[in-house]
């Protein structure tokens, strides 16, 4: 896939809407943070030092050992414009930090976008694996094999006592950040979500919005991840996250059953109102779109709205974002223009689906 196609293609592997528990778990993500010994952290590096890190990382990515498993294409942040960077953020392929603050940053992408390797973000290397559904172990297996290939060629910053050294203290140790993106509309509707979020903080996990730290949980989407890596093994981190996520999944299912059994008419009314608005509205702002799409997604998962694939809703999560809308238009848009284009895009996509029924 060409660099241009990564920006224009609305589809990523994680949007498939398949895999274990995919009615609730939109995606699973694993990140591994690594730094190179005798190289300043990216925040302190000069341009030439940062360029040297990119060169070393891309040499390994082009090696026979890596190419046997993954064909990766490098995109340099200083060679793409702000809208293109924003599209990559909205597709969850790079972090806002790499897009906005990194000096001489780059990302290496696999064609199906399930693997992305950020270079010169907060750390020299951040390996990301992003899969559809609840697939922590599979994400770990892919990520650790990539990490092994890098470690054979690069001299990692590692301390026998502390583990892998990272720029952020919360990543020191294993350097692993695992997360699952959960769609929890029923827990929000039944007003149980606050209690659950408070309990999560007490077991070493944290909940953020869909774009990570500081972002809002739009469309009833919550990102659950481990908070620290020091003093815990990789298996401990993954098993703890798996266990808590499994409990939340079951509680969401119980809440959905309750809504169906006790408030079915009002639930269906809410779902079909949102579906109708998305089918016919002429303008829709981003927060409303996220909420309406959440309602429709719930209707699909409960069988209330038939013959619509979750893939369509996952795709719209990205294509209705400001960056993608503007990049697709080929120009910057005012908020009103974005709202109009967003509504038109949703109408067209849903009508294509209806015509295929």
UniProtKB/Swiss-Prot annotation:
It catalyses: L-arginyl-[protein] + ATP = N(omega)-phospho-L-arginyl-[protein] + ADP + H(+). GO terms for molecular function: ATP binding; creatine kinase activity; protein kinase activity. Residues 24-255 form the Phosphagen kinase C-terminal domain. GO terms for cellular component: extracellular space. A motif (RDXXRA motif of the pArg binding pocket involved in allosteric regulation) lies at residues 338-343. ATP binds at residues 27-31, 92, 126, 177-181, 208-213. Appears to be allosterically activated by the binding of pArg-containing polypeptides to the pArg-binding pocket localized in the C-terminal domain of McsB. It holds the Pfam family ATP-gua_Ptrans. Keywords: Allosteric enzyme, ATP-binding, Kinase, Nucleotide-binding, Transferase. GO terms for biological process: phosphocreatine biosynthetic process. Its EC number is 2.7.14.1. InterPro entries: Arg_Kinase, ATP-guanido_PTrfase, ATP-guanido_PTrfase_AS, ATP-guanido_PTrfase_cat, Gln_synth/guanido_kin_cat_dom. Catalyzes the specific phosphorylation of arginine residues in proteins. HAMAP family: Prot_Arg_kinase. Belongs to the ATP:guanido phosphotransferase family. NCBIfam families: PRK01059.1-4 (NF002194), PRK01059.1-5 (NF002195). This is Protein-arginine kinase. It comes from Brevibacillus brevis (strain 47 / JCM 6285 / NBRC 100599). The lineage of its organism: Bacteria, Bacillati, Bacillota, Bacilli, Bacillales.
